[in-house]
Amino acid sequence: MDASVVRFSQSPARVPPEFEPDMEKIKRRLLKYGVDPTPKILNNLRKKEIQKHNRRTKRETESEAEVYTEAQKQSMEEEARFQTLRREYKQFTRSISGKRGGDVGLMVGNPWEGIERVKLKELVSGVRREEVSAGELKKENLKELKKILEKDLRWVLDDDVDVEEFDLDKEFDPAKRWRNEGEAVRVLVDRLSGREINEKHWKFVRMMNQSGLQFTEDQMLKIVDRLGRKQSWKQASAVVHWVYSDKKRKHLRSRFVYTKLLSVLGFARRPQEALQIFNQMLGDRQLYPDMAAYHCIAVTLGQAGLLKELLKVIERMRQKPTKLTKNLRQKNWDPVLEPDLVVYNAILNACVPTLQWKAVSWVFVELRKNGLRPNGATYGLAMEVMLESGKFDRVHDFFRKMKSSGEAPKAITYKVLVRALWREGKIEEAVEAVRDMEQKGVIGTGSVYYELACCLCNNGRWCDAMLEVGRMKRLENCRPLEITFTGLIAASLNGGHVDDCMAIFQYMKDKCDPNIGTANMMLKVYGRNDMFSEAKELFEEIVSRKETHLVPNEYTYSFMLEASARSLQWEYFEHVYQTMVLSGYQMDQTKHASMLIEASRAGKWSLLEHAFDAVLEDGEIPHPLFFTELLCHATAKGDFQRAITLINTVALASFQISEEEWTDLFEEHQDWLTQDNLHKLSDHLIECDYVSEPTVSNLSKSLKSRCGSSSSSAQPLLAVDVTTQSQGEKPEEDLLLQDTTMEDDNSANGEAWEFTETELETLGLEELEIDDDEESSDSDSLSVYDILKEWEESSKKE
């Protein structure tokens, strides 16, 4: 054998790391074939993979015992020496970059590059800024430049780029240039929760792709959980749908991720969306729900009161999967489950808003059949169902059963008991129940003492209620005093104790500062008890102080408008309405439509016109009272063109006005609607574009019956003379008040009577002067923007 040929069978100097199989890959393989990856199965597969690897390594080692030449041996030694030097260089670089403080600078560039290239990199990367140009580049200038760029380029950066604060005192660390997995998840969650977008938006797709995540099961659980904590359930649903809709990631779908999404939707009180996700899980073998998923959907439906849907879920829980289920490969797979105590408690929770008190007995029978023992929550929910259904005797029965079964009553149980005694009128028994709770060592909660305090205030014992408030203050995690006192004032108002409301309000000022909720409640108290001066004083104080805890909201203006309307203070009503609109709030049609109608009949027609235009500009349908009142006003003025426009609008509305309602409306306004105007309205009704609509046909029938039953020569007390021109011309809009006497010829010609200023003010009309200019018009024709402009100018003058 040649001497230059030697046998080289030694192993390399570097010991290979111990082999560790990829457990995530094993899990995905098991889920793909429908096997539940339990810890025992995973451990056995891990051992087998290690044994397989060891056998393969042994075979490769035996086969590598070959003959190498001197040149090959020298080449391998040089490669080993290079790897050693490379490892030492990495360790040295890591130790240098890890140092902080001192004069240790950052090594930039490569040793073989020129010094000019290194300096250029220093300028570009911002290293050693203080040494550049003798310190002319300062940190303050960089911060100022940052603010200028953010201000000028906000239209580019807004809702697109995350601008994070960077500490200029810290050195730039190349080792931390790229975020790790946790940082990438945090940034993605912050960006998604900061904007309302769905999976179809291009920014959403770009955010997901730029995150650099693989969207494994662990990463998806973290993302969905953190989005749920930020109350971003829409974004959580979008992430799950986008990730698992991709064909490359379909095999990565996880039941646990969908279960986490169910819990997020339940926490956000979105039962319909949760039900859709649950039905999607039922249609796929890979996502088929387990007991944890059934718990999530049951609790969500129970809190929403969807009893029928919850019972359907329980039926599906006991049935085998249908043949339409995807990925159904194992024939002997049987995921049938039986409801447990959590599911039955969810049924009781759903019975509370639906008042299904008979279902309580069925639940206890089912528990007995399945060998389940009711716990404290079961008895407490049963008591609450009976309380809301008015079965107070059964509330006490379940309380006794709870104590006899050995379950210790909790504070929430005593809260239900106190409320039941309150509704029964047993005030002393409610106080004794709370004292009994304290004697038994049950740690009370703020809700128990708050419930008892409201009970006492509702029955005129506010001084005793203050003692319960003192006990509540000593507890942890109790509600703030401002909210507590607001609830006590509301309880006293519901009990009819107005003096107690004011006494509690004065007592509250010594303990804490009233917030806007308390002020709104006092405005409600003053407004509903004819105390306009007190309400006005409090409202002026709220508006003038401009403090953070007393910022007027929509309820503030609403209660003040109600107080002004109840006291017939229409001038101040107009002032409050103007202030509300200038503050950016709009009137609630459902609550204040009747008040606007009363104000318009008192002479404040501009408010009704503004509210009507504002509602139309918002894209909503005005209240039916707005249409009918404006129609009667236009008919009385003789403005039949506007009347026809209103009729065309109301014909396309979602509501309908019957013939009886039209007739009652004309009878209600017979004092200022002439029979002649009704005749003319009936004649102009032919010009309507939607005559066949039910509302318009009912109006036509009512006008025909009204005009046919009365004489056309009959005139009301106040007649408005409207001179109509030929067809196609605009009718006169000025009210002609002429100096006439009560003669028959003037009455026949349709001329108006003359009234004094006091009589006109009483009738709710404004005296208008005759203007020869044809372009002049009264204030009712102003647009919503003109009215707002006048209000702003008047407020500036004040």
Swiss-Prot record:
Record has Chloroplast as a keyword: yes
Region (Disordered): 1-21, 50-73
GO biological process: chloroplast organization; plastid transcription
Keyword vocabulary terms for this entry: Chloroplast, Plastid, Repeat, Transit peptide
Protein name as catalogued: Pentatricopeptide repeat-containing protein At5g67570, chloroplastic
Main location: plastid
Superkingdom as given in the UniProt entry: Eukaryota
Subunit structure: Interacts (via C-terminus) with SIGF (via N-terminus).
Assigned GO CC terms: chloroplast
InterPro entries linked to this entry: DG1/EMB2279-like, Pentatricopeptide_rpt, TPR-like_helical_dom_sf
PPR repeats mapped onto the chain: 254-284, 290-324, 340-374, 375-409, 410-444, 445-480, 481-511, 515-545, 553-587, 588-622
Biological function: Involved in the regulation of early chloroplast development and chloroplast gene expression in a SIGF-dependent manner.
Subcellular location(s) per record: Plastid, Chloroplast
Family according to the record: Belongs to the PPR family. P subfamily.
Gene3D superfamilies: Tetratricopeptide repeat domain
Protein's UniProt keywords contain Plastid: yes
Record NCBIfam families: PPR
